[in-house]
């Protein structure tokens, strides 16, 4: 049974990824920061799609290193190591730089960048020691590649994710573990719903529309296939042709 952890999978892109991987036969371990019921609902949906036993959803704050380690170590002690991890969960706290407060900077960096370390540190060595030729996919963003007005903190964090992915991919390549990033553009999620002038944003996208969570999930699912075993250290953009 190939178990895959998908963080932030109670809604949005994370849930779409979880459901798509379940359709491909993976036993998906769902996760939420707070909403345990929603995460377990995702886990139940995944079990129906995959035909695999329903996995207990995990609940932890990625910025809390001790809590992340405790939850993951307990899960692996009971169920074994993961075949793959999709690091999707993240936060944003947008503001123009002159009024960007230190707390908003810390919140985003601690969750979106340091949280990636907190998540992967407990799971990578069990993958290596069990000779699992697995998959790690981290969600970055168009902001992490090109930057975005009002998102200095978020852009910095997501750029850092790309750097971490590229370095970790080199370290794990000889183990057969691939490490890649997927960088969505504007996707139809709760975050996109807060855009003040959506039509202006749509006109800036060559395809003249926002992407869907399912389109992002399809790219992640490809990276989990056997055919993608030679794809590592890459950043795949899903942005409708923004650049």
Please give the residue ranges for each predicted region:
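Alpha-helical segment proximal to the catalytic Tyr-Lys
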Residues: 125, 129, 170-174, 229
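Substrate-binding pocket helix/loop in short-chain dehydrogenase/reductase
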Residues: 96-97, 101-109, 201
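C-terminal substrate-recognition "lid" of short-chain dehydrogenase/reductases
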Residues: 210-238
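Residue(s) in the substrate-gating loop at a strand-loop-helix junction
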Residues: 141
